[in-house]
Amino acid sequence: MIITMILIFVFGYLCIALEHKLRIDKAAIALLMCGALWTVLSLLGNDAQIGTQLIEQLGDTSEILFFLIGAMTIVELIDRHGGFHVITDHIKTRNKRKLLWLLSIITFFMSAVLDNMTTTIIMIMLLRRMISGQKERWIFASVIVIAANSGGAFSPIGDVTTIMLWMRGNVTSGLLVAKLFLPAPVSVIIPTAIACRYIPDENAHPEKLDTAPKLPPFVGPRFSHFVLVLGVGGLLFVPIFKAVTGLPPYLGMLISLGVLWVFTELVYDHKQNMEESIKNRVSKVLKHIDMPTILFFLGILMSVAALQSAGLLTDFADFLDKNVHEVYTIAGITGLLSAVIDNVPLVAACMGMYPVVDTAALASSLDPVYMQAFVQDGIFWHLLTFCAGVGGSLLIIGSAAGVVAMGLEKIEFGWYLRKITLLALAGYFAGMLVIFLEHLLLG
C-alpha cells in the first residue's frame, strides 16, 4: 500500500509539473490524485477509522479553503472599488528594479502581521497595476512569494506553523522575533538582489489591463478609501481575533467579509439612481473568485493528508531521528521537504517526534548537549520555524503563497523551477548560516 501511494503521489506531482505540456489543468490532476490516494488507503489499509480520519482531515483543509475564499473576496472587493490605487499612487518610483526592492520590503513586513496567502493576494493585485508584461510579473510575483514566506517565518502570527509552535509553547514570541529577525531578511535580500539582474533598469509603463477595476458611477475616492480601510482593517482583525478568542482564523476572516459585505450593501442601497448591473456587490464579485485555485489547493492538501494518515510522515521523522541525530540537518531536510509537502503536517510531525524538553528531562538525559536543542526556545525550534517557512519558497507549489501566486498569475511550475528555485535556495542556506553564526557567537 505504501509503495502504491508513493507512486501515485509522485506521478501526480510530475503531471502537475508538466501541466503546461499536458494541457490539463493542475486542479483536475490534484483532485484525481487526492481521490486515488484516499481510495487506496481505504481499500488496502487496515484502519477501520479511515472514514473518521477523512472527515477530520477535510475539516482541517476546509478551514484553509474558507480562509482563502474570504481573503480573496475581500481583496477582490477592494480592487474593484479602486482601493489599491490609494497605495499605488503613493509609490512614486517607476524604476523596475527599485520597485522590486520596494514590493519585496513591503511584502516582508506585511506578511509578519497578515498571513502569507492574504499578503500575496494583495501584493499581486498591486503588481498588476504597475507591471504589464507577463514574464516580468512572474519574476516580481516570485520574489513576493519568497518575501511573504520569509516574513511569516519570524513572526509568531505570520504563518500557520509559527502559530502552532507559539501556541504549543515550543517558542516564545519575543525570542522568536529576536533570533530570526536577521536570518529572515537575509533569505529575502539575496534572492531579490539576484532577481534584479533579470529585470531591466528602466521605468515601468503599465498598460490598461483587463483586470483594472471598473468603478461604478458616483463611487469616488472617498468610498474607495472606506472600502480599503475596512478591508485591510478586517484582514488585520483576523490575527487579533485568533489571539483573543482562540477560535480558528477562518472564522475571523468570514466575520470581516460579512462586515464589508453589509457596508457595501448599505451604500449601494442608497444609490437608487444607479443601475443594478454596474454595482459591484459582493454577490457579483464572488463570481470572479478563482475557483480552480481553490480546488487545486483542496486536492493538494487532501493528498498530503492521505500520506499523513498512512503514517508516512511519522515514519520518515523516525528515520531522521535514528540515522541523522543532528538538529541542523534534520531541520534543513524538513525545510527542503516543505517545498514538496505541506509544511503544516511536517512541523506537526516534528512536534510529535520531539516534545519540548523540561529541566528534569534535560538533567537526566544521556545526551544533554543534543537534548538542549529541544528545550523551549531551543535552537531546533527556531531552525524548524525558519526552514519550514522559507523552504516552501523553493518550489511554486511548496507554500500557500506560491499556490495562490501560481493561480492568480498562471506561473508555470517549470519556469519557477528554472528561474527562481536556485535563488530561493541561496537565500535559504544563507539564512541557515546566519542562524548558525548567531548560535555560535551569541548562544
Placement of each model-derived feature along the sequence:
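Membrane-interfacial helix-loop connectors
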Residues: 37-47, 58-59, 110-147, 151, ...
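Transmembrane helical segments that form the transport core of multi-pass membrane transport proteins
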Residues: 81, 90, 103, 234, ...
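Transmembrane helix-loop junctions at the membrane interface of multipass transporters and ion channels
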Residues: 162-173, 233-247, 436-443
